[in-house]
Each structure stands twice: as structure tokens, then as C-alpha cells.
Amino acid sequence: MGIKKNSENEKIRKSVDEFYRKISQDEYRTEVSPEEVSTSLGYSTEMMEQLPKGTDLGLSCGNPLENFELKNRETLIDLGCGTGKDLFLTRIKYPDSGTLYGLDRLDEMILKAEKIRDMKKFKNIEFRQGTLTSMPFEPESMDKAISNCVINLEPEKQTVYNELYRILKNGGKFYISDIMLKKELPKEWKKSEKMHNTWVGGALLEEELKKVIKKAGFKNIIIIKDEVTDAYAEKWGYGLKIKEYIQRGMIMGEK
């Protein structure tokens, strides 16, 4: 059973990697632009105009920047940072905070993020290639963590939250935007690689997600629910009625 499960998880990860590699290389496009998705989620045009074209890939389902503040010298990690959009916007908003770290599975994403960082001369932003299930960071090294529509891509969510607990300092907080289920998905959706690639296939019900987070050791868990935007559903829904089954959540907790 364990071997079969691991095999299925690796199949999902491989499919996800291939899908996002295509996106990073601009080989996957839809009629809805990345900018339309971001604007629908509360990213202002003024904010996005401060970043080079191509930084925004339209991979967000929320806006964690609306929910946290960074004090001077506080460190922050973005789990599944992609090309670094949320980190760059955080640096613009908090120029005197500590080092910002981005973690992503794909070298292609890291290379693009580093290129943008160097082009815009952003200071104290470091990117590392690695997985959410084995984060290449020391214990209790981060004050805050964010993530934007990424953790649902990883089959072993308990391991992710365990790792997040490990790297956060005591009193550290996380702010995670992700997709949650309103009700159980159709079986064919759960088995669909493309639904896993776009956060739906791996989504959990709210109570299931809370159990995972509590088991990792977190406290003061708050989940703010909202409908997914029409732009998001149109871009990533494959023409299916995904809004009947999913919602977006702003998930917050403290170590």
C-alpha cells in the first residue's frame, strides 16, 4: 500500500513539474491573461506595473500580502515562490525587513526569479531550489511564511505543514492562500492529472485541512473563505463548473 501510494504521489509530482515547466517557458496560455487573474484577486495595476512583464504568471488564487506586516529585520519565506512576484511586492512594501526567501521545486522558476531580482536590483532576497516536504532551511529560522496556491499541488500535505512548523520561529506565523473544497469532487476529477496541476484535484475540505494544520502543532488557526473569482475559474477551470466544488481560503496560523 505504501509503495503504491508513493508511486501515485510521484506521478502527480511529475505531472505538476511538467505543467509548470511549460508555464515558466511561456508554452501554456489561456484566453484569460495573468494580469486579469491578479487584478481580480486584489493586486492593483499600480503594484504590478512595478514589476517587469512576465513576472506575473497568473498562478495566484488569493493575495496573502493583504494579511500580514513585516517588522524591521523579520525574515519571511514564500513556499512555492515561482518567479518571485509576492516576494518582490513584499520587498517594495517593506524595504527594511530582513531577508526574504523563495523556495521552489523548479530550477526554471528560480532562474527567472533571480534574473528579475538582479534586473530590478532588489536587495536581501534569496531563492533556493527544493521541495515543500524537505525544506532546505534551518529549524526556527523564519518569522513569517506565505504561500499562494501551491501547497495543494503536493500530495503529502501533512509533511509540508510539519516542515513549515519546523522552520518557523516560536511565535512565527503563516499566511497561506489556497483552494479548499466545498464538497467532495467527482471521482474522475480526483484522478485527473490536469485537475491536480491546477490545485483542484489535491484540495481538502476545510475540516480536513484544519486537522492537518493542528496535527503539525499550530495554534490560533483562522480560515477566511471566499468564492474563487470568475477570472480564476475561467483561466484554470477547463470549462468545467469548478465553482460548485471549490472555494479559496486565506489560511493563517501561529507556532
Predicted regions span which residues?
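Class I SAM-dependent methyltransferase SAM/SAH-binding core
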Residues: N72-S134
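Conserved alpha-helix/loop element of class I SAM-dependent methyltransferases that forms part
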Residues: P34-T75, L89, K93
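A short glycine-rich, Lys/Arg-flanked "PGG" loop and its adjoining helix->strand segment in the class I
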Residues: Q158-K173
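Short, glycine-/aromatic-enriched active-site segment of Class I SAM-dependent methyltransferases
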Residues: M180-V200
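A short acidic, Gly/Pro-enriched loop at the edge of an enzyme's catalytic core
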Residues: T133-K144
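Short alpha-helix
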Residues: G202-A216
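Core SAM-dependent methyltransferase catalytic element
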Residues: Y232-K255
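N-terminal auxiliary segments of SAM/dcSAM-dependent transferases
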Residues: M1-S38
